[in-house]
Amino acid sequence: EEIEAIQQGTRGEPPKSLENLAILVRASHQMRMFEDRFLTIGLPYRVIGGPRFYERMEIRDAMAYLRIVTSSEDDLAFERIINTPKRGLGDKAQQKIQLKARQYSTSLVEGAKILLSEKVLGGKGAIELGILLSNIQRWENLLKDQAFNHIELAELILDESGYTGMWQNDKTPDAPGRLENLKELVK
């Protein structure tokens, strides 16, 4: 609203070009509301000093979890979350899933289900994949049943998937900021 007022000159001042306007924020998660508004009104912008909110790794990961729940056909989302956090599903296991999905002309989620039913995968990876697939199905049902509002469901998905816990256990200096970004995303 403030930016539109400056641009249109509705506060008793002449209209101003936004080319030389800057917004300073203390923490990166504060940029989200600005970015949302800029995208809504079609205002081009640049973020200096860090990536845009929706380009951050943790936001893209979280969005992939939310996308796979709304569409289990979303192979890009599944590829992003299958081993995030680590589930013991390395490149070989992921290649087997891709081959099975291609063989049956189906999604990666369905390919993973087929692979598990054929007992092609073993060990920790198979157990963790089974848990992930059953969680995705359960989250889909919760979404359909409208058992939770969207904020509660997003928090539940990120918690139960282990994604929030991964960042809580991370001891790098970036981890607290990433957790703040996740909180900002779901609120």
Residue ranges and their predicted role:
Residues 1-44, 67-71:
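Helicase P-loop NTPase motor core
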Residues 8-17, 29, 115-187:
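Accessory C-terminal helicase-associated subdomains
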Residues 40, 51, 55-85:
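Conserved short internal alpha-helix adjacent to the catalytic or cofactor-binding core
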Residues 95-100:
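C-terminal helical "lid" of AAA+/P-loop NTPase domains
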Residues 101-114:
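A short beta-strand-loop micro-motif that forms or neighbors metal/cofactor-
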